A protein has these predicted regions:
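N-terminal core-entry segment
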Residues: 2-256
Length: 256
């Protein structure tokens, strides 16, 4: 690498580095074990969704989406319906999440990485991709979400924020990759989603309501919307993680 390229790489934002990696990763790069585990999480997520489909909060959400969702290529699990990717990602993520049975990863912050899988599903269907791309999306969601969970001590939950805040950073990487966006477009998608979706920890404090298991699906939905906007040329802050008044600036020097 030349001195010029090294200087550029040193100045490159964390968002740009992650976006480059998301855009470049290929199914052939994944180990056999990673693919096997991704398939396990995929099957587990579908099982959770089929159980979630029966729940009252999901039925309410589906009624609302029946009224407002547009036509599209994205499947709503358990219904046989095809709607727009933004609405489908919310419906499917809520089904997976609502019973609290899906996977969990807990380090400095907790998360349920499979909540992000519906972003990959909806966008892969829109892009008419095969199952390999779906597996890539699932792996990306888990890899990035879990890394964010280890980013600082204390985590954002200890500071009064909900981990859906982190999902709003991760889901546009997944959605953007599934839509085959350039790394620059993915970077903008992250800026669009993350800059407007910070979730208060109040949803898990005191009396629990339906929103406890809805905020993360909404963050997943945010990433899909952001990726679709970036695909058309919409821009967002490029240094939303490590720039001025970005994530690390706002949460303090403990963030890595």
């Amino acid at each position: 690498m030349s001195a010029t390229k090294e200087a550029v790489a040193a100045k490159e934002s964390i968002t740009a580095k992650m976006a480059r990696w998301a855009a470049a990763v290929d199914f052939s790069h994944l180990s056999q074990d990673a693919v096997f585990q991704a398939k396990r999480f995929l099957l587990d997520s579908i099982g959770c969704a089929l159980g979630g489909y029966q729940q009252h909060d999901v039925k309410i959400a589906l009624q609302v989406l029946d009224e407002v969702a547009g036509r599209g290529p994205a499947t709503v699990i358990g219904t046989g319906k095809k709607i727009d990717p933004v609405s489908a990602s919310l419906a499917n993520a809520l089904m997976i999440r609502c019973m609290d049975y899906n996977d969990i990863y807990w380090k400095q912050d907790p998360s349920h990485p499979s909540d992000i899988f519906p972003a990959a599903l909806a966008c892969c269907e829109r892009a008419k991709s095969d199952g390999r791309e779906l597996i890539v999306g699932l792996v990306l969601g888990h890899e990035f979400e879990m890394r964010f969970c280890e980013a600082a001590f204390p985590g954002i939950r200890e500071r009064g924020w909900h981990h859906a805040t982190l999902t709003a950073f991760v889901s546009p990487f997944v959605a953007g990759r599934a839509l085959h966006l350039s790394w620059e477009q993915i970077q903008h998608a992250v800026g669009i989603s993350a800059s407007r979706h910070c979730t208060l920890g109040a949803v898990t404090a005191g009396k629990l309501t339906m929103m406890k298991n809805t905020v993360d699906p909404m963050a997943t939905q945010s990433g899909v919307l952001a990726a679709l906007m970036a695909e058309r040329g919409y821009t967002g802050p490029e240094q939303v993680i490590d720039g001025k008044e970005g994530l690390t600036h706002c949460f303090g020097p403990e963030w890595k």
